[in-house]
């Protein structure tokens, strides 16, 4: 009897400890990719992206190890009210050695409070650094609506016919919209705070299986006292987005139209940029002035074509028209069909084509890329991960123009100017050539 009594406190302590561990359970999410590759002409794997394009077809065409590690926890809950703490640390290295040191990027640290306002059931208050309602095309790793950064907002306000979200974020800019003192002493600063104010109305059901999302973003350079922008700087801009999502063929199709002005045209995703740093009050990076407009028409999706076939696809036209004639027109189209031999083994073929025309020279850069991959994945969907794949990639390109990146922006007043491929000073264009690579890669998200 005494032995039993002596064991009781220990049992209670162990049970309490187990309950504490359960109560403090941490959510672990993330993403990672890594591998090894070779180039047909020798050396490590090369990756291929058209000069002037903002992304590339990624299957068998990623040359880095990249990871995002997310830790989060619901730290308080009472009824339907709760607080959630979320973090995200990202790493990227060149995958060339065993020991590759890198400084982590602290990409997310935020708290989200749900159902805290009785008058707005279902709404969430949040503050901190956050990936905020990002919209992307997975197969080209292209984010076309992404205002992520430090910020605050109120999201998912139920209006009956849709959900309203309001947010403000910041993206400080090195160079870009840099400023200097208004007196005769030019005190160049490294960063200028760029503010973005975002309004979205989503989940509006407008047809069977179809929803509409509308958004408007305003971005501005927020100057310090007694400072002014460099002459010719793009001070602010707007971006308007309409996206229709249709459920179809066990997947989805998204059709997107976006229009942006001035400071919102450089990145074209909802974050603004201004002008480059002035040097000696006369030398500028040539691409500082982004006054003008952007028009983007995009269609992409992922569908099932039967028991054994899935497919991703994208088609996009983007026109950046700048007052300084340094804009581009970018066409891209690609498909990634997947044939499933078994629920965990598949073959993928990715074919992508890019064409980028220089507004200044009228010349075009084009590239097509073909990748064949054999893959083993955790499930029978094109989205199933983790995946291990072996691949072979062939790319062929013909580039007629590039950018003048000779010397540096302090000494070259035309730094960043679009120039023909035969520009005497040289340019960042790749000429007419082709190459093939092969290797193996893992990819996972959880």
Curated annotation (Swiss-Prot):
It is a multi-pass membrane protein. Induction: By maltose. It catalyses: beta-maltose(in) = beta-maltose(out). InterPro entries: G_neg_Bact_CarbUptk_Porin, Maltoporin, Porin_LamB, Porin_LamB_sf. The record marks 31, 66, 99, 252, 383, 445 as: Greasy slide, important in sugar transport. GO terms for cellular component: cell outer membrane; pore complex. Pfam families: LamB. The record marks 143 as: Important in sugar transport. Residues 1-25 form the signal peptide. One of its GO terms (biological process) is monoatomic ion transport. Gene3D superfamilies: Porin, LamB type (2.40.170.10). Its main location: membrane. GO terms for molecular function: maltodextrin transmembrane transporter activity; maltose transporting porin activity. Keywords: Cell outer membrane, Ion transport, Membrane, Porin, Signal, Sugar transport, Transmembrane, Transmembrane beta strand, Transport. Homotrimer formed of three 18-stranded antiparallel beta-barrels, containing three independent channels. Involved in the transport of maltose and maltodextrins. Belongs to the porin LamB (TC 1.B.3) family. This is Maltoporin.
């Amino acid at each position: 009897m005494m032995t039993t009594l002596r064991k009781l406190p220990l049992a209670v302590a162990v049970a309490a400890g187990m309950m504490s561990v359960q109560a403090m359970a941490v959510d672990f999410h993330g993403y990672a990719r890594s591998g090894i590759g070779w180039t047909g002409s020798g050396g490590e794997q090369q990756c291929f992206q058209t000069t002037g394009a903002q992304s590339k077809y990624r299957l068998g065409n990623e040359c880095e190890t990249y990871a995002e590690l997310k830790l989060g926890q619901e730290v308080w809950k009472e009824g339907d009210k709760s607080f959630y703490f979320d973090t995200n640390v990202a790493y990227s290295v060149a995958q060339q050695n065993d020991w590759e040191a890198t400084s982590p990027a602290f990409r997310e640290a935020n708290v989200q409070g749900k159902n805290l306002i009785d008058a707005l059931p279902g709404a969430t208050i949040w503050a901190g650094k956050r990936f905020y309602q990002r919209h992307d095309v997975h197969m080209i790793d292209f984010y076309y609506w992404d205002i992520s950064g430090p910020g605050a907002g109120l999201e998912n306000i139920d209006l009956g016919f849709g959900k309203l979200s309001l947010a403000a974020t910041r993206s400080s800019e090195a160079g870009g919209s840099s400023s200097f003192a208004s007196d005769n002493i030019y005190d160049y600063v490294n960063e200028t705070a760029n503010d973005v104010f975002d309004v979205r109305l989503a989940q509006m059901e407008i047809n069977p299986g179809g929803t509409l999302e509308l958004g408007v973003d305003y971005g501005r350079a927020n100057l310090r006292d007694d400072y002014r922008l460099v002459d010719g700087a793009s001070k602010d801009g707007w971006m308007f987005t309409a996206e229709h999502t249709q459920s179809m063929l066990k997947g989805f199709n998204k059709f997107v139209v976006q229009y942006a002005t001035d400071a919102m045209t450089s990145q074209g995703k909802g974050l603004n940029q201004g002008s480059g740093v002035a040097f000696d009050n006369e030398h500028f990076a040539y691409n500082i002035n982004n006054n003008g407009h952007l028009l983007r028409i995009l269609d992409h999706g992922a569908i099932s074509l039967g028991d054994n076939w899935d497919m991703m696809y994208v088609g996009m036209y983007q026109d950046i028209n700048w007052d300084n004639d340094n804009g581009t027109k970018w066409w891209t189209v690609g498909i990634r069909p997947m044939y499933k031999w078994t629920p965990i083994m598949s073959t993928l073929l990715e074919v992508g084509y890019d064409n980028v025309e220089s507004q200044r020279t009228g010349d075009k850069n084009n590239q097509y890329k073909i990748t064949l991959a054999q893959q083993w994945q955790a499930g029978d969907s094109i989205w199933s991960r983790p995946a291990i794949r072996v691949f072979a990639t062939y790319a062929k390109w013909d580039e007629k123009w590039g950018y003048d990146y000779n010397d540096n922006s302090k000494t070259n007043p035309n730094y960043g100017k679009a120039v023909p491929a035969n520009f005497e000073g040289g340019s960042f264009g790749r000429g007419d050539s082709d190459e093939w690579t092969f290797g193996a890669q893992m990819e996972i998200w959880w």
